[in-house]
Amino acid sequence: MIAQLVIAFYFIVCVGIILINCFTEIISRCRSCVLKRREQRYCEEYRQLFLENIAENKKQEKRLVKELHSTSRLLTFSEALYKVENSMPEQFQQGIASVSRLMEELIPVYERKSDMEKACLAYVFAIFHMTKFQAKEIVFPFLFDLLGNKSLYCRENALRALYSSEDIHAVMQALTFLDANEQLLPHEKILADGLLSFDKKEELIPLLWKKMSEFHPTMQVSLLD
């Protein structure tokens, strides 16, 4: 009799665990679907905002900046920009300059956030080449601070953003800084890819050759490879 009660109790516990797991999985999937639909809605809203020229509507501009204080919204906004860039490249080129300058307002906010969130902002700056439209005195201090960060993700995205600025002197300053702090050097592929994609490489290469003998072997190998 006792054995039967133990077996029955064990069976009930097992069934209960299975039901709880099933319920948890259903809730998780429902939540995931809701979040996905919400992100899709935000993405479409941001896409429309971009196409309507955000900078011409100060109320919308203020609301957007406030929303982009959230890193998840920032990444959703970047997804919207990516869609516009790929589907309507002309409209993207017409609007990206004003949006880039608007994004400068996020720097003081993200400076107080975690390293990963700071890196996300630098990543968005880099992939859309926003830094070439932004005020150097605002964006460069932020990026150079990230370049000296202990987080590799911060350093790599900061360097990408500096490359995308098309500012030769900023790139040379970044490479010189990394050479003087070899422990901060990102993967050599990041260094090489940045040089290959740099729009003003014809002007940059002579400066690099002039400086090459002063660089440490590690930096020399990274640049020459």
Name each region found by the language model:
Residues M1-Q40:
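N-terminal signal-anchor transmembrane alpha helix of single-pass membrane proteins
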Residues E61-K66, A97-Y110, F133-L146, D167-D179, ...:
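Amphipathic alpha-helical scaffolding segments comprising HEAT/armadillo-like alpha-solenoid repeats
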Residues Q48-E56, K83, I127-M130, S164-D167, ...:
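Positions within ordered alpha-helical repeat solenoids
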Residues T24-D115, F125:
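N-terminal topogenic membrane-targeting module
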Residues R47, L51, S78, I107-E111, ...:
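Amphipathic alpha-helical repeat scaffolds
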Residues K113-D115, K150-L152, E182-L185, F215-P217:
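Short inter-helical turns and helix N-cap capping residues of alpha-solenoid HEAT/ARM repeat scaffolds
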Residues F23, L147-G148, R155-E156, R160-E188, ...:
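Long, contiguous interaction/recruitment modules in multidomain scaffold/adaptor proteins
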Residues E79, S87-A97, A119-T131, E156-E166, ...:
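Structural detector for internal amphipathic alpha-helices that build alpha-solenoid repeat scaffolds
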